[in-house]
Regions:
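Short hydrophobic-acidic sequence motifs that mark active-site Asp/Glu residues
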Residues: 64-66, 131
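Vicinal oxygen chelate
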Residues: 2-10, 14-23, 43-44, 53-57, 76-149
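A generic structural micro-feature
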Residues: 9, 48, 80-82
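Short, charged/polar surface micro-motifs in flexible loops or helix N-caps
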Residues: 60-64, 71-73, 95-96
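Core segments of cupin and vicinal oxygen chelate
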Residues: 11, 18-63
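Residue-level recognition of conserved beta-strand positions in structured domain cores
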Residues: 67-69, 136
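N-terminal beta-strand motif that seeds the catalytic metal site of vicinal oxygen chelate
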Residues: 2-28, 85-90, 140-149
């Protein structure tokens, strides 16, 4: 039973994140800089509860982010305690390149991650107020990668 559960859990991966934004092109500026190997996979026009919106799928053959341009108002206050998305994170093999590409595209680091000898991480705010973390692991050992010292 334990082997079956372990095998099934390894088959589950995150396919996509669906984000409501205000401007798809501004949003793509950020994500294209972060993910130069990703592309717009498709898109179109749809309606969400009576409001028309444009949408795109931006990613690769296996994972993507959906951007829908029917957003109004501001994203949640990241310093507050409202229910909602705090941040999401992506693993990279070269965090310095991600930082450099985002800087060239006009995006500065919002905050540095905590000092840890097994990983480096930084946080950016995308054009819609979503906090996006990038992390580079400096070890292949799970006990080191997942250390909380």
């Amino acid at each position: 039973m334990e082997t079956k559960r372990l095998t099934e859990s390894k088959m589950i991966t995150l396919e996509h994140i669906n984000l409501v934004v205000t401007d798809i092109e501004k949003t793509l500026t950020f994500y294209k800089a972060a993910f130069p190997h990703w592309a717009v996979r498709g898109g179109g026009v749809s309606e969400w509860h009576g409001k028309p919106r444009n949408w795109v799928h931006f990613g690769d053959d296996y994972q993507y982010i959906t951007f829908n341009d029917d957003g109004v108002g501001d994203n949640r206050d990241l310093t507050g305690h409202q229910v909602g998305l705090a941040h999401f994170a992506f693993v990279t093999s070269n965090i310095k390149s991600v930082i450099e590409r985002l800087a060239i595209a006009g995006f500065a680091i919002d905050k540095e991650g905590a000092d840890n000898k097994y990983r480096e991480n930084v946080y950016f705010i995308d054009p819609n107020g979503y906090e996006v973390e990038f992390v580079q692991y400096l070890s292949d050992l799970p006990c080191e990668r997942n250390s909380y010292d």
